[in-house]
Structure formats: structure tokens, C-alpha cells
């Protein structure tokens, strides 16, 4: 099971997450309590292992700005949490992830229209897009096609206590956590370690 730790804001957390086995790290460039500057993101990314995906999170940002930040920071993928359509996705010409809030099985069917490398299924949007720490009904994704499952990233209220059930129900390609590995709003490296251990155990 692949694991993404999202909302990275400092070098120490990034390095420890990689040591514990994270397959991807997320850097939020949209409005969020976990927002990071491109300059700091670049510093961190330059120190990370080559095999770890470096994913930039954007919400309704212009194609030009996304491309510039991607190139300057050394991102491998972009994660789109806004109203981006296939036209914008094609213009980006960058490996991409489309994030969708899930309220019914219709959302799963709509996801298949997006021409992205991955689809991230999350809890419905609130003030901030993603990272709200709220789970949705995983059963809504239990019967997706094999093709969609192989490009599914599951997010939304995941933590070390519920990750086994989430993986067993959805069987995604990757799981994504942010607030579920925090203590008082800050990344907690021990929680990151336990989350990664639990998630990896599920795929043995």
C-alpha cells in the first residue's frame, strides 16, 4: 500500500516521513493552515529521495502559476482541488491528481471523466479544500471498477485507528493523510510512523 503524507511544512518532518516509508509527500500552495511557500518547498524537496513523489496541492490556480511552481520546486505531480476541467489538465502537461469530494456513488462515476493519472477521493469540501479531518462513507467506493481502483487515492479523516478498515473496504492504490497524523495542528512524527506501519501492514 502506497502512503502519502500531505501538508508538509518543515524539513525534519519530511525527512522522517521518508525514513518511515512514505511514498509521497504533499505540499500545499493553496490557502490552508498548512500552506507553504514555494521557496521553502524547494529547499525541502531538494533533500528528499528521488523515489518519493513530491506533490503540489493547488485550488483553482492558473496553469501558468502551477507550471512555474512545479518547475521551480521540482514537483513530480500536481493535485487539483478546485474546479479544474480536462482542458486545463491537458494544458498543464504535468502528471496530475484530481481531488473529488464524495457524497454519493455518482461522484465515483463522474471521476472516470477526468483524464488524470490519479483520482483522490476525499470528504466533501468545507472552508479549506482537503485536510478537514472528516471521513466519508467508504462503502460508496467499495464497488468501483478495477481500472478506477488502480488509480484511486483515498483521503478524508484517515488515521492509524481506522486505516485498516478503510483499506479493506476501498482497496485503493494509495492512502493520503494530513490531520490524522497531527497533534494540536502540527505534524507528529510518531503518528506518521504508526500510520505508515499500519497502512503497509494491510497490504502484506
Swiss-Prot record:
Disulfide bonds: none annotated. Pathway: Amino-acid biosynthesis; L-tryptophan biosynthesis; L-tryptophan from chorismate: step 3/5. Its EC number is 5.3.1.24. InterPro entries: Aldolase_TIM, PRAI_dom, RibuloseP-bd_barrel, TrpF_fam. GO terms for biological process: L-tryptophan biosynthetic process. GO terms for molecular function: phosphoribosylanthranilate isomerase activity. Keywords: Amino-acid biosynthesis, Aromatic amino acid biosynthesis, Isomerase, Tryptophan biosynthesis. It comes from the Bacteria. It catalyses: N-(5-phospho-beta-D-ribosyl)anthranilate = 1-(2-carboxyphenylamino)-1-deoxy-D-ribulose 5-phosphate. Belongs to the TrpF family. NCBIfam families: PRK01222.1-3, PRK01222.1-4. This is N-(5'-phosphoribosyl)anthranilate isomerase. It comes from Bacillus cereus (strain Q1). The lineage of its organism: Bacteria, Bacillati, Bacillota, Bacilli, Bacillales.
Amino acid at each position: 500500500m502506497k502512503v502519502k503524507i500531505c501538508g508538509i511544512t518543515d524539513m525534519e518532518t519530511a525527512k522522517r516521513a521518508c525514513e518511515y516509508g512514505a511514498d509521497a509527500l504533499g505540499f500545499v500552495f493553496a490557502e490552508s493552515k498548512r500552506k507553504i511557500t514555494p521557496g521553502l518547498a524547494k529547499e525541502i524537496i531538494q533533500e528528499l529521495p528521488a523515489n518519493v513523489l513530491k506533490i503540489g496541492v493547488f485550488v483553482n490556480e492558473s496553469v501558468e502559476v502551477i507550471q512555474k511552481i512545479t518547475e521551480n520546486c521540482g514537483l513530480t505531480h500536481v493535485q487539483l482541488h478546485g474546479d479544474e476541467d480536462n482542458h486545463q489538465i491537458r494544458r498543464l502537461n504535468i502528471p496530475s491528481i484530481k481531488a473529488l469530494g464524495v457524497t454519493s456513488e455518482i461522484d465515483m462515476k463522474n471521476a472516470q471523466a477526468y483524464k488524470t493519472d490519479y483520482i483522490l477521493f476525499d470528504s466533501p469540501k468545507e472552508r479549506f479544500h482537503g485536510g478537514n479531518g472528516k471521513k466519508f462513507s467508504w462503502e460508496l467506493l467499495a464497488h468501483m471498477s478495477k481500472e478506477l481502483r488502480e488509480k484511486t487515492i483515498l483521503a478524508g479523516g484517515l488515521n492509524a485507528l481506522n486505516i485498516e478498515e478503510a483499506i479493506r473496504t476501498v482497496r485503493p492504490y494509495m492512502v493520503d493523510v494530513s490531520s490524522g497524523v497531527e497533534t494540536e495542528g502540527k505534524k507528529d512524527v510518531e503518528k506518521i510512523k504508526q500510520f505508515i506501519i499500519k497502512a503497509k501492514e494491510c497490504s502484506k
